[in-house]
Amino acid sequence: MVRILAVIPARYASERLPGKVLLPIAGRPMLQWVYEATIASNVFDQVAIATEDPRVVEAAAAFGAEAILTSADLASGTDRVAEASLHFPDCKVIANVQGDQPFVTPGLLQALVSPYRAGELPEMTTVGGPYDPAQDADDPNTVKVVCDQRGNALYFSRSAIPYPRTVVHDLPVYHHFGLYAFRRDFLAQYRQLPPTPLERCESLEQLRVLEQGYRIRVVPCADKVIEVNTADDLERANAWASQR
């Protein structure tokens, strides 16, 4: 069976919320929540953290995680994942588990790699969760994805897509959570692809894949996840953790 590696990119120099991966949620660094949830899912053969900052390496060691110190000037989290994956050559599928999703569920992680566990070898997979247009349509921090009839992504956007000119039920539109898995050979190929216009416009790295003519399989999952992008998100995460 194919071996699958999970890498958690943990960039300390976050623009919207600096140092957020080490900010406390109910007394533990956010990164520790992500790491422990990923380990507890029993989905992956190996789990590692990738960061540009020695402070994150030190914090990871304190809670028993393996952390890889990567280059500081990488263009994206996926580039950081790719660099870290070079330390694990026996893993043929590489998953990117976001460092700002402290309550990521086993269901989401299982969905992410389910095509590979079923013997398929798509270039890349991601997960689409429940989408509430009334709440999420105008929120640029909620990334939307629309899919074709075969479950492949047509487009990702921070805007509301599709435009509701006509009321249609059961549209293939999801809340995109930013989890990715790659075949190792495609991840290496991805790193060689130059940034693309739509990627730069939306600031969504996955658009590079679509613009270059490759496919991203979107696996639906009913689970939801809290993403921490702002101080308000962090406050909500702390409130949620205190109720667990």
Swiss-Prot record:
Pathway: Nucleotide-sugar biosynthesis; CMP-3-deoxy-D-manno-octulosonate biosynthesis; CMP-3-deoxy-D-manno-octulosonate from 3-deoxy-D-manno-octulosonate and CTP: step 1/1; Bacterial outer membrane biogenesis; lipopolysaccharide biosynthesis. GO terms for molecular function: 3-deoxy-manno-octulosonate cytidylyltransferase activity. Keywords: Cytoplasm, Lipopolysaccharide biosynthesis, Nucleotidyltransferase, Transferase. Pfam families: CTP_transf_3. It comes from the Bacteria. The keyword Endoplasmic reticulum does not apply. GO terms for cellular component: cytosol. GO terms for biological process: CMP-keto-3-deoxy-D-manno-octulosonic acid biosynthetic process; lipopolysaccharide biosynthetic process. CDD domains: CMP-KDO-Synthetase. Gene3D superfamilies: Spore Coat Polysaccharide Biosynthesis Protein SpsA, Chain A. Its main location: cytoplasm. It catalyses: 3-deoxy-alpha-D-manno-oct-2-ulosonate + CTP = CMP-3-deoxy-beta-D-manno-octulosonate + diphosphate. InterPro entries: Cytidylyl_trans (IPR003329), KdsB (IPR004528), Nucleotide-diphossugar_trans (IPR029044). Its EC number is 2.7.7.38. It is found in: Cytoplasm. The keyword Transferase applies. Belongs to the KdsB family. Activates KDO (a required 8-carbon sugar) for incorporation into bacterial lipopolysaccharide in Gram-negative bacteria. This is 3-deoxy-manno-octulosonate cytidylyltransferase. It comes from Synechococcus elongatus (strain ATCC 33912 / PCC 7942 / FACHB-805). The lineage of its organism: Bacteria, Bacillati, Cyanobacteriota, Cyanophyceae, Synechococcales.
